[in-house]
């Protein structure tokens, strides 16, 4: 069927048609022109190679593929070739099954598992043989066992049978019973013997052995059967089942003495039941299972499993075995914490990029330079502010010795809260610079925490505090809100400066029930007017001086509190009251801190 306008019909590929069928049908649409014969041969060779590679990926060998292609032809479609390969592979598998492989293949080993081991052609040993090979040989003193079962009056052969059966039930295969040969004679009233046929049955099974005995001049000559018993048990590294201690044999040879002490298994008969002790060598010796084994069982297999299982609440103090817990020794939490504390290395001082530790003088000078730079920024900002400017209720405050603060999200300098608290600062927690650098909001929260530590609960009136005195060009237009709350809201935008020195509180303030209640605002003053500088402590410095020296000490104290904890600054400035150089004081503070690490 030809297409419209004389075009050749285009063969559509069905979804089930393979790639090779589509290429074969496409190549059969027309004979190639003479100029394309070479290209067609190369294409057919490439197509054949692709077919071979495809079938080899499916697991068929090159020999099988070529034999099938010779049988069906090179132009055979993929499905036909694949069907023939399946039949050929099935026949090959039958041939392999009928003809045994002379060299068995090695087992596959997972990647990283090392070299594969040679196949073990020997059949695995049964579980009973493995169990019996781990058990010690048993040598039974037949005369002692029979007389014990007969209550020392009758030679009861049934007692020997009970003992032998007990060891057979436990998996022992090497059992030997020694009995004097004269016990095979007919019983007499003075020598009663019961169940004598058991001796012959055990002898047929090669379990019982008769020791030699004979009559000489009408008298019975009996060999010492105990020496047979101890000697065989010693040479076979087994155990001796008897209630006799063989004192005479212990004195003959020293190795026998030790062997009898360690390998003697005593027993009891309770109503035709053979019962050896569970602890043959005493309470602190091995158990009966380990006593009868060549290699003792591990502790996990010996211990009795805990009846509570996973619900056990005794922890590491439980004396029973928990298979779900790791076998390594466990320690308590306190012991682990102590071990970790001993293993953890001490913290070394931080180093700079060149690997050198910063000296105290360079560290203090750099920090003080940053503090002075922030103070200059605050002065510039305050000088640019005009008294008449008003930004929708927002107020900018200025003091000559203030420190510049950035809004939330910016970077600022640390701020010392010593001027707001007239009490001693030894009990205040140290506020890190990272916490105070996050902005005025975090400053308010830090100061709230500091005041909360001193004041206790909301219902407890704390000690009198020096209030924060705000300077506003608008006088009473500011609402009477909490000092820090109004301060935080008024400084929400732009850069502001917080004064470092404040005038003392008025002589009489009404007591506040809560620390957040505001103090009455002072009379309005000009923004550019510099307030009188007061030293900390309402006109009295902590070092007992007044005047210009106290003012200079207060300034140095304020700067150092922005770098070091206040209690360290007070301690060092108290020791060196005449020293006013910030760098030297910083070096002394670092030296004092190294000498008193606990403070």
Curated annotation (Swiss-Prot):
Compositional bias annotation for Low complexity: 358-375
Lineage: Eukaryota, Metazoa, Chordata, Craniata, Vertebrata
Residue span of region Disordered: 1-40, 90-133, 343-420, 522-546
One Gene Ontology MF term: DNA binding
Tissue-wise expression: Expressed in heart, placenta, spleen, kidney, liver and lung. Expressed in leukocytes. Expressed in monocyte.
Region (Necessary for interaction with ZC3H12D): 301-457
Alphabetic keyword roster: Angiogenesis, Antiviral defense, Apoptosis, Cytoplasm, Developmental protein, Differentiation, DNA damage, DNA-binding, Endonuclease, Endoplasmic reticulum, Host-virus interaction, Hydrolase, Immunity, Inflammatory response, Magnesium, Membrane, Metal-binding, Neurogenesis, Nuclease, Nucleus, Phosphoprotein, Repressor, RNA-binding, Stress response, Transcription, Transcription regulation, Ubl conjugation, Zinc, Zinc-finger
Annotated phenotype, changing residue 312 to G: Inhibits transcriptional activity
This protein's name: Endoribonuclease ZC3H12A
Membrane topology: Peripheral membrane protein
Record-listed Phosphoserine modification sites: 99, 344, 438, 442
GO BP annotation list: 3'-UTR-mediated mRNA destabilization; angiogenesis; apoptotic process; cell differentiation; cellular response to chemokine; cellular response to glucose starvation; cellular response to interleukin-1; cellular response to ionomycin
Presence of keyword DNA-binding: yes
Keyword Transmembrane: no
Entry similarity comment: Belongs to the ZC3H12 family.
Ligand binding (Mg(2+)): 226
Positions of the UniProt region annotated as Necessary for interaction with TANK: 81-150
């Amino acid at each position: 069927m030809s297409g419209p306008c004389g075009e050749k019909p285009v063969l559509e590929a069905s979804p089930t048609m393979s790639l090779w069928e589509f290429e074969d049908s496409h190549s059969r649409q027309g004979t190639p022109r003479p100029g394309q014969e070479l290209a067609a041969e190369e294409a057919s060779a490439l197509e054949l190679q692709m077919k071979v590679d495809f079938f080899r990926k499916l697991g068929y060998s090159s020999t099988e593929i070529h034999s099938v292609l010779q049988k069906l032809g090179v132009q055979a479609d993929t499905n036909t070739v694949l069907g023939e390969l399946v039949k050929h592979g099935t026949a090959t598998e039958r041939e392999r099954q009928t003809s045994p492989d002379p060299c068995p293949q090695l087992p596959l080993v997972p990647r990283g598992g090392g070299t594969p081991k040679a196949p073990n052609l020997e059949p695995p040993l049964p579980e009973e043989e493995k169990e019996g090979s781990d058990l010690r040989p048993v040598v039974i003193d037949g005369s002692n066992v029979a007389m014990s079962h007969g209550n020392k009056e009758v030679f009861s052969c049934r007692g020997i049978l009970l003992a032998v059966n007990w060891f057979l039930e436990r998996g022992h295969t090497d059992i030997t019973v020694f009995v004097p040969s004269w016990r095979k004679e007919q019983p007499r009233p003075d020598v009663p013997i019961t169940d004598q046929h058991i001796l012959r049955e055990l002898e047929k099974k090669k379990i019982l052995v008769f020791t030699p005995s004979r009559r000489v001049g009408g008298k019975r000559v009996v060999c010492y059967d105990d020496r047979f018993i101890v000697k065989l048990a010693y040479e076979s590294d087994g155990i001796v089942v008897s209630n006799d201690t063989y004192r005479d044999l212990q004195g003959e040879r020293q190795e026998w003495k030790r062997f009898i002490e360690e390998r003697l298994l005593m027993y009891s008969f309770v109503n035709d039941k053979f019962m050896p002790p569970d602890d043959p060598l005493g309470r602190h010796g091995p158990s009966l299972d380990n006593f009868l084994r060549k290699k003792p069982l591990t502790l996990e297999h010996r211990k009795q499993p805990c009846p509570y299982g996973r619900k056990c609440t005794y922890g590491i103090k439980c004396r029973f075995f928990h298979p779900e817990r790791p076998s390594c020794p466990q320690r308590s939490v306190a012991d682990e914490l102590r071990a970790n504390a001993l293993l953890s290395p001490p913290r070394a001082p931080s180093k700079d990029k060149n690997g050198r530790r910063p000296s105290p003088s360079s560290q203090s000078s750099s920090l003080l330079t940053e503090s002075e730079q922030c103070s200059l920024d605050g002065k510039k900002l305050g000088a640019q502010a005009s008294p008449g400017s008003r930004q929708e209720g927002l107020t900018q405050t200025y003091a000559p010795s203030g420190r510049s603060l950035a809004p939330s999200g910016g970077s600022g300098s640390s701020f010392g809260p010593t001027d707001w608290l007239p009490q001693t600062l030894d009990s205040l927690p140290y506020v890190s610079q990272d916490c105070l650098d996050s902005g005025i909001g975090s400053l308010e929260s830090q100061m709230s925490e500091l005041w909360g530590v001193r004041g206790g609960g909301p219902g407890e009136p704390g000690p009198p505090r020096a209030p924060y005195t705000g300077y506003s060009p608008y006088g009473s237009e500011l609402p009477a809100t909490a000092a820090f709350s109004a301060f935080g809201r008024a400084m929400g935008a732009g850069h502001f400066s917080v004064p470092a020195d404040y005038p003392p509180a008025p002589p009489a303030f009404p007591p506040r029930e809560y620390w957040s209640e505001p103090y009455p605002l002072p009379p309005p003053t000009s923004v550019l007017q510099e307030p009188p500088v007061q030293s900390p402590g309402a006109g009295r410095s902590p070092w007992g001086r007044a005047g210009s020296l106290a003012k200079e000490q207060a300034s140095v104290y304020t700067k150092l509190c922005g770098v070091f904890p206040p209690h360290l600054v007070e301690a060092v400035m108290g020791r060196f009251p005449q020293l006013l150089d910030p760098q030297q004081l910083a070096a002394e503070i670092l030296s004092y801190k190294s000498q008193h690490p606990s403070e």
